[in-house]
Amino acid sequence: DQPHPGVWECRLSGDQDGAEYTYTLVFEAGGSGTESVDPYARAVTANGQRGVVVNVDKLLGQATRMPSFGPASDAIIYELHVRDLTIGPENGITHKGKFLGLTEAGTRTDAGNLSGLDYIASLGVTHVQLLPVFDFGSVDETGDLRFGAQYNWGYDPVHYNVPEGSYATDPTDPISRIREFRQLVDAFHARGI
């Protein structure tokens, strides 16, 4: 169907949860098509090759809301990069380079200092600004993700509405990146951050 000029719509019957898909775009009548991933996808396969139908509300349930915050001038904001803060070989974090690495409590460096979430909380931080956590293109999510291997801060977005797969424990599972990012957010909220 074409409800408005330049807008196309398709409805499928049945439960499509978990179905992978792409669009084929044809710009001129009789022209060849260009395959594209849905720019509004909420889940994708590894390396963002295909969109995946997922009911995020059903998957995650209701989000935990933080209590209202006082004056903005009281905010203590800490900017962090998921991989940088969790990948180090001496930080005591189990899920290195992953969203889940920022959910771990009781982590310490080899020298005995707080690390990860405990370290951030000990600073009195009220807010964190995460460097890009959306799906970006320059890291092969199925490649070598160990310390010293592929590295990028993520300023090459591909799918703005999808968490980055290299930060998930299983980048081939479209749901794990969503669920684990939510766990990261919940862990910070549990600390009042």
Model segments located where?
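Surface-exposed loop/turn motifs at beta-strand-loop junctions within extracellular Ig-like
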Residues: 27-29, 134, 185
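Short amphipathic alpha-helices and their capping/turn segments at secondary-structure boundaries
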Residues: 63-70, 114-126, 185
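Carboxylate/His-rich catalytic cores and anion/metal-binding grooves
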Residues: 120-149
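Aromatic- and acidic-residue-enriched carbohydrate-binding clefts of CAZyme catalytic domains
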Residues: 91-107, 140-190
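Conserved, mostly hydrophobic/aromatic
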Residues: 23, 80, 120, 130, ...
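Short, acidic/polar
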Residues: 102-120
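The feature marks proteins involved in alpha-glucan
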Residues: 3-104
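Loop/turn elements at helix/coil->beta-strand transitions in domains of secreted/extracellular proteins
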Residues: 74-75, 123-128, 189-193
